[in-house]
Amino acid sequence: MKKILFLTILALGIRTNTQAQTTWAEHVAPILYNSCTNCHISGGIAPFSLVGYSKAVANANGIADATQKRRMPPWPANSNYKRYAHERILSVEEIKTLQDWVAQGSKSGDISKAPADPKPNTGAVTVNPNLKLKMPNYSVNTSTDEYRCFVLPTGINVDQFITAIEVVPGNRQIVHHVLVFQDTSQIPVNKDKADPAPGYLAFGGTGSNTSQLIGIYVPGQEPYQFPTGFGARILKNSNIIIQVHYPAGIQNQLDSTKVLIKLNTGSLRPMIITPGINHNNSSLTNGPLYIPADQTKTFYSKTVLNFKLSVFAVGPHMHLVGKSIKAYNVNGKDTIPFVDIPNWDFHWQRTYILRTPTIVEK
């Protein structure tokens, strides 16, 4: 009996000693470069880079902790409720690889087997845009969050359709997010003229009721590419207005963000990009929107559509007060899920693009 026990322990020991080593070069770098270094790169909005072994090993414990708790990569949407295109979600196997790497001493491995270091994303993805619109250089000096609008003339003299839109931050370290509007009125133009600095301050929009949202940018988000045959209508004589959010504490930083747009003059099916659905007091079924001090309240909002549409993407938003949000469509006996965010975080807002457009009956 003692001999059998000894042989069993010896066999287990041999198996443990010959277990494959998880290394940065062959196993960890591909994960980080695919899922993290869009932001964690020199010149990116993240506070430190994860490009190269030395940067990764210096943050090894933080990587293991943040990914195991799914704080990183940031993806607030509940993947058990709805799946999307361009998801930033690590698989269970990838998380285990990162855990094993740290547990085994965060070894570099054969550096020659590592993927090439990613380059800072300073350029654009959109090829041959019809419009290249750039805001004037603006020096950011702010102790509080600054929301600043810039008017970008288009020169468009006939109605057309936008088929793709991309925001390229001029300074990725300071641009928190960008909202893109079109407006045919002179309100934004006059506000811009009244402010001696480039652009003008405006919180919650452009300050014009006629502005229409046509695009959103957050760090790491892909350019809008509408499905074939669809487009967002852009009106003749319109200006593009971008509202750029600069976080608090920025000093003497220059930005010159630009917008690239692809156009089509054909007959396309119109896309409607609107922040208005379930976004006001009139849609609340248990309003008004009032929360007494030291209380938590749940509000329900409902909009009845009188037309049929195809949903391409959803962009839930609650700014700083909301804690969780869920959106869905009830069609007869069917419930169509759109998005569920159990723990809302203003800093990780984004647009969620559906894998296929979803038809919603009126």
Region spans (language model):
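A composition/secondary-structure signal for short, hydrophobic, low-basic-content segments
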Residues: 15-17, 36, 173
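Single-residue recognition of alpha-helix boundary sites
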Residues: 13-14, 63, 188, 328
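Aromatic- and Gly/Pro-enriched helix-to-coil junctions and flexible linker segments
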Residues: 21-150, 239-243
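Beta-strand-centric surfaces of beta-sandwich/beta-rich domains
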Residues: 74-75, 79-84, 114-160, 166-310, ...
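Bacterial Sec-dependent N-terminal signal peptides
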Residues: 1-23
